[in-house]
């Protein structure tokens, strides 16, 4: 993975996410491991090489419409002793509506974290 080039804080959260590979078509349903304004880390039973274009459907709250985001893999690694991969996915295109929803959600997490450490 190399040096940490993250520009925004990440939060350890576990949310359902669907990864749609555009070419060739493939669908993986999994969970996030962490989330930031710029991307997500998740697990996958399928490998997605670096620069694979993906469409993500990310559910932040049960019963809410998922965020639909375009992204691409920036790294992947094999999970030791398993048949899974960890994926790092950077968001490419986020609508203004979904940016607002993601920003509100991450701000809430940040405030909760700050208040719990006092």
Q: What are these model-derived regions, one by one?
A:
Residues 40-44, 55-58:
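Short, well-ordered beta-strand segments in soluble/periplasmic domains
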């Amino acid at each position: 993975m190399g040096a940490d080039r993250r520009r925004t804080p990440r939060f350890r959260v576990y949310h359902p996410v669907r990864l749609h590979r555009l070419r060739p078509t493939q669908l993986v349903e999994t969970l996030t491991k962490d989330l930031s304004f710029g991307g997500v880390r998740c697990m996958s039973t399928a490998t997605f090489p670096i620069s694979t274009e993906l469409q993500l459907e990310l559910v932040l709250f049960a019963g809410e419409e998922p965020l639909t985001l375009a992204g691409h893999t920036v790294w992947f690694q094999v999970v030791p002793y398993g048949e899974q991969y960890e994926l790092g996915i950077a968001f490419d295109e986020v609508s203004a509506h979904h940016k607002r929803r993601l920003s509100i959600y991450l701000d809430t997490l940040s405030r909760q974290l700050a208040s719990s450490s006092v």
